[in-house]
């Protein structure tokens, strides 16, 4: 069992991504087409995490031309360049699968979580 943990520790790359379910994020990832390599972004709400050790993934949902699009990203994948948190969401669930049933503006509506910054006087 210790051998598995050693291999997982070596392969963990993107530990710096700090975001939660309900946050609106932009994931910038590499697409390799033959000899060409380009960056593409996907922006949406994080609706779930699947915690499976090194196979940890997160699911992002967005509405594109009135159609819901979901994409699963592995957290420790080398194709992910960066994850930008655009907005912090305030939710009371670990999985936001109920967002799939919402229509129109309600499909992307989540309360914003306010962060308090300490200021020195």
Curated annotation (Swiss-Prot):
This is Large ribosomal subunit protein bL19. Keywords: Ribonucleoprotein, Ribosomal protein. Pfam families: Ribosomal_L19 (PF01245). GO terms for biological process: translation. Belongs to the bacterial ribosomal protein bL19 family. NCBIfam families: rplS_bact. GO terms for molecular function: structural constituent of ribosome. It comes from Borreliella burgdorferi (strain ATCC 35210 / DSM 4680 / CIP 102532 / B31) (Borrelia burgdorferi). InterPro entries: Ribosomal_bL19, Ribosomal_bL19_CS, Ribosomal_bL19_sf, Translation_prot_SH3-like_sf. One of its GO terms (cellular component) is cytosolic large ribosomal subunit. This protein is located at the 30S-50S ribosomal subunit interface and may play a role in the structure and function of the aminoacyl-tRNA binding site. The keyword Cytoplasm does not apply.
